[in-house]
């Protein structure tokens, strides 16, 4: 089974999150059989995030220093973009996020940053 973690930042764009959950969700039902075994999970350093235009999402998995190693086993890290006016860039220096990105980068794992999320990768 392949596992994809979608990292939720405060102020993320709901559509940019939903595109991954929807595509891979449907893929597991109607996609080619050899690609159906993909698990997508939303993760964050917060239990809930408020999206750009007000929707609230609860992360499926809260990532802490105690369980970050579990996320290191995932195959890909997706970072949806967001809006600065909704505090999207406020927590880009979060240590948990930085450790995840560093691990995925150093281990040649897939990192997908959508739109403004690229800014959160710049150090």
Predicted regions and their residues:
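Extended, subdomain-level signal for the structured scaffold at the beginning of enzyme domains
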Residues: 1-109, 119-123
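Short, thiol/selenol-centered motifs that function as redox-active sites or metal-ligating centers
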Residues: 114-115
């Amino acid at each position: 089974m392949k596992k994809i973690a979608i990292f939720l930042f405060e102020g993320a764009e709901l559509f940019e999150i939903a595109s991954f959950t929807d595509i891979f969700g449907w893929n597991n039902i109607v996609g080619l059989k050899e690609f159906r075994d993909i698990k997508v999970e939303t993760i964050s350093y917060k239990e809930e995030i408020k999206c750009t235009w007000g929707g609230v999402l609860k992360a499926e998995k809260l990532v802490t220093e105690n369980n970050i190693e579990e996320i290191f086993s995932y195959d890909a890290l997706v970072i949806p973009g967001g809006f600065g006016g909704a505090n999207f860039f406020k927590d880009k220096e979060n240590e948990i996020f930085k450790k995840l990105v560093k691990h995925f980068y150093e281990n040649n794992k897939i990192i997908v940053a959508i739109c403004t999320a690229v800014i959160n990768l710049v150090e």
